[in-house]
Amino acid sequence: MEAQVRIVTRPERDRLGEGPVWVPERGRLFWVDIEAPALRWLDLASDETGTRPFPEPIGWIIPRAGRRDFVIGLKSGFALFDLEADHVTPIGNPEPDCPDNRLNDAKVDSAGRIWAGSMHQPETAVSGALHRLDPDLTWRRMDGAYGVANGPTFSRDGRILYHSDSAARTVFAFDLAADGTLTGKREFLRFPEAWGWPDGMTTDADGCIWIAHWGAGRISRLDPEGCLLRAIALPATNITSCAFAGPELDRLFVTSASRGVEHEPSAGALFELDVGVTGLPPRAFGG
């Protein structure tokens, strides 16, 4: 089937839109513009949008289970954010020895832990890493030597973590144990040049992986073995991430970036797609 694509009407374009996350308790899709920098949101019932500027790059936002506030990934590190009080409380910086790095993308596993990647802001050093933030607000470095650590997602049963190094055009798979240990790092998929660079990912209810293609103007659906099932072209070159949203989890939202392609009318837009499949329920941070 052909995907129905809608461009969400709003007053701004994102310079680097990323990290869409559905928060059903609020009826909102949240995402970030890392380079504005700003937090964005869309009310799915009213189609109204909102924004909250930040004084430093913000890489992602994740709700906390049973609470009204969020965890966010800033250039300065992990922090708690209360939207209503408009207050940020720092947790800590997982990379104090890498002042040019910033947190880039994150997801929550079935145990309520956040898995967050980092990257070198000028993208000239292989100093990115993969960190795990536990519900007790302590963190641990789990893997390293990434150019641009990006797009974590999980298998349907939660036993495999998928994580990419965009700079290397490679998506890796890890075995994820119940205690949060990673083993068996392996290449899941290497992008050919025509595919651009792998960016954000999400998993659907069938266990298939949806992945954004930076530089190639599309998203793709892959089976759990990494075989291409479907590719959907979008009217923007730099596609950054995707997430299922809505009460039925049947609306796929896709972020994009206008950086470097400002001449493209739809670059930096938020797209909504009807792709005929549903997503997995979103997870909140357990701490």
Question: Where does each model-flagged region fall?
Answer:
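Beta-rich, blade/repeat-based domains predominating
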Residues: P11-R26, P55-G73, D97-R113, D143-I160, ...
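Blade-level signature of beta-propeller repeat domains, shared across WD40, Kelch, NHL, RCC1
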Residues: A243-G287
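A short beta-strand motif characteristic of beta-propeller blades
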Residues: Q4-R10, D47-P53, T89-P96, L137-G144, ...
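Conserved beta-strand positions in repeat-built beta-propeller and related beta-rich domains
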Residues: V23-P24, L29-E35, V71-S76, I114-T124, ...
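A short loop-to-beta-strand structural motif that recurs across blades of beta-propeller domains
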Residues: A38-R40, G77-A79, G128-H131, T170-F172, ...
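Loop/turn-rich, solvent-exposed surfaces of beta-rich toroidal or solenoidal domains
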Residues: R169-T170, F174, R190-C227
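Hydrophobic alpha-helical segments and helix pairs
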Residues: D86-M142
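Short loop/turn segments immediately following beta-strands, especially the blade-tip
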Residues: F174-T181, D274-L280
